[in-house]
Amino acid sequence: MALLQISEPGLTAAPHQRRLAAGIDLGTTNSLVATVRSGKAQTLADEQLADEQLIADEQLIAGEQLIAGQQLIAGQQLINEKQRDLLPSVVHYHPQGIDVGWKARNLAALDPVNTISSVKRMMGRSLADIVQRYPNLPYQFHASENGLPMIQTARGLVNPVQVSAEILKTLAQRAQAALAGELDGVVITVPAYFDDAQRQGTKDAARLAGLHVLRLLNEPTAAAIAYGLDSGQEGVIAVYDLGGGTFDISILRLSRGVFEVLATGGDSALGGDDFDHLLADWLREQAGVATRDDHGIQRQLLDTAIAAKIALSEAETAVVSVAGWQGEVTREQLESLIAPQVKRTLMACRRALKDAGVTADEILEVVMVGGSTRVPLVREQVGQFFGRTPLTSIDPDKVVAIGAAIQADILVGNKPDSDMLLLDVIPLSLGLETMGGLVEKVIPRNTTIPAARAQEFTTFKDGQSAMMIHVLQGERELVKDCRSLARFTLRGLPPLPAGGAHIRVTFQVDADGLLSVTAMEKSTGVEASIQVKPSYGLSDDEIANMIKDSMANAQSDITARKLAEQRVDAARVLESLQGALAEDAALLSEQESAAIAQAVALLQQQMQGSDPQAIEAAIKALDAQTQDFAARRMDASIRRALAGHSVDEV
């Protein structure tokens, strides 16, 4: 007979059937790993860290200190419970091995060339893009054959994917030690505006770390999971995510367990790191030291700035000492330095609200995510902008990892996913080029993903045997104003008259935001496809500018589109007429031929102009002149078809 199974409340009655999953917040400054235990999501600490300090005193920078109020914070990094959960996203390479986390972070001042931090900013970008965006990085870069960055270290060349893999590997080891088993899968969070290349790079890093990726999850969506499930809210909320290296604002509607992202915005090159660098530059000026070529001192200044920023979240003043100089910095001075950056985040919030079609008054709650939201000025300004006190009940450093852990627990099969539905969105419209340099949008902006759309297109010329598929991203009407994503060619089309072949083009965007495009000719089944992986990323500022430009140029774009469409129609009419005249010009009298030639000349003249209505009128005039010719051609075609056949046979 069956045995009665008894379990503790909150625990599964069949623990051997429970699969192990984790959520990973792969951050620019810090990373975390979380899991669901006894029905509750919690971040996992590194139990192997010493209680007193992270690394031996001889590895510290002698004499550097910061005084906040009466508290002395020495060069060593003291550990508290929160720091146990955080893993600095820093990797140090040395001849004997690789260090990740706190030890690597503290070695950055001693060996900056071999200590790689904020690698997330390099993910999916070309070397040229990285050098342009971040000209002061201390690393020795080399370009791979395809232009991607390679970093020279004491252990040889490494790329951003390999560096990220070391961070993921360390987090996975922490999770497996805590759970006493191998992970069945992980959910990794990424910024909402990571493009295809950046998302694919994250997946590749996870694969290199030996992890099975259940899903990539947008960071703001992960935060919504953490808060939405815990508090059961319904309505429109804003997720303000200001981390170390990226800023994201998302407007979400929560309704009966459905998480729908109404709009997103932000800046992939703005975060707490920028606050730190601004304060470090200020300290450098105050100390009167030249550090541009001394990466060690620059790192010391940066560490001091970070400690001062943290101290000023609690105290009004902090006394700092660096490079033989000692002085005081106040919260007011820090706020004056970072005020422009905070203002930039609020401008992005305003754009996101407009995109979502809601006002600040309609926002029920504002969720704060990211360690930089602890800065008092940030909380104050965000509260004033939305007219309500932001939510901070879940640790802003941990909320994303907690949301990822909840989603991982669902995807791995430990609980039914009917509790929750996630609807992320596409930030910019996706489409392809048509004749005349026009853009045909296939999937519009803010469409929820995963998504699939298909449209049919046809050939322009008689006997056309191939078609170039040009995939585009953007909101404008003309190809020249949009971003090119990829090109591929569909060959082997049947040699039919213009318009005879029918090509079905399908766009598919998966849950991770990766785009696949397939083109198939319906009668033959011949097809070609491509997976879009841009060689470098698209910043949030560029996305915002593309949307802004589309609004500012809406009227002129419509006019330009009408003009291009009329020119394409005119070209199609002229090409068709040219073929007809080549076959049946004998059906026309000299007077008729002259009238048609005159109408053709007028149409060609109007095509050179910029008046779409004039082109349309010229097309109609030519059509009127050729109606009798078309009727005669039809009669002649019928006579040829019936030649040699009796009435009975017909």
Curated annotation (Swiss-Prot):
Protein's GO biological process: chaperone cofactor-dependent protein refolding; iron-sulfur cluster assembly; protein refolding
UniProt repeat feature Sequence, residue ranges: 46-50, 51-56, 57-62, 63-68, 69-74, 75-79
A Pfam family matched in the record: HSP70
Keywords: ATP-binding, Chaperone, Nucleotide-binding, Repeat
Annotated region (Insert), positions in chain: 49-82
Family annotation (InterPro entries): ATPase_NBD (IPR043129), Heat_shock_70_CS (IPR018181), HscA_NBD (IPR042039), HSP70_C_sf (IPR029048), HSP70_peptide-bd_sf (IPR029047), Hsp_70_fam (IPR013126), ISC_FeS_clus_asmbl_HscA (IPR010236)
Gene3D superfamilies reported in the protein's UniProt record: 1.20.1270.10, 3.30.420.40, Actin, Chain A, domain 4 (3.90.640.10), Substrate Binding Domain Of DNAk, Chain A, domain 1 (2.60.34.10)
A Gene Ontology term for the protein's cellular component: cytosol
PANTHER family: HEAT SHOCK PROTEIN 70KDA (PTHR19375)
Biological function: Chaperone involved in the maturation of iron-sulfur cluster-containing proteins. Has a low intrinsic ATPase activity which is markedly stimulated by HscB. Involved in the maturation of IscU.
Protein's name in the database: Chaperone protein HscA
Lineage: Bacteria, Pseudomonadati, Pseudomonadota, Gammaproteobacteria, Enterobacterales
Gene: hscA
